[in-house]
Amino acid sequence: MSSSASYWAGKARQFRAHVTARVGVDERARLIEWLSPPQLALFDSMHVADRRHGLDVVATLRADGVTDDEILLAGLLHDAGKGHTGVWPRVAYSLGQAFGPWVWRIASYIPGWRDALRRLMDHAETSAVLAGEAGCPARTVELIRHQDAPIDPVAGRALQLADEAN
């Protein structure tokens, strides 16, 4: 029961974080020193909740001692492929992960949700492609592509743990 309660508490925290997400002007300004113009444009194109999440993942990675810019860049941009998917399709997607694909089948009847759910399902690959197009290093692209099932046992797992923590 406690694992179920902690799961739902985590989902409630994610929901609250999504609807209250903000990125400060100073946070955005610091990225100018770190990102190339195409990478910054990709960051700016992301939903504000995904930008906030990316910044939080980077902060967690740094707190864990990660200094490798390729890993940090993957943490920042790993959800770029989610686009501007709203909160309710994201809730349906999470419910589908927890209870099975029948949730997605039902939710896909809601106008616009089929595409939104597909974006969420495919976001790792889409994010990797977008990162590559923005000039990210090949290693960053691969870390993003394999974010859910890391093939790099150190960097990939660090990214996955930081993502899950946020």
Residue ranges, per PLM feature:
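Non-catalytic interface/linker regions that flank or bridge core catalytic/transmembrane domains
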Residues: M1-L42, D148-I151, N166
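Divalent metal-dependent catalytic cores for phosphoryl transfer on phosphate-bearing substrates
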Residues: I32, P37-N166
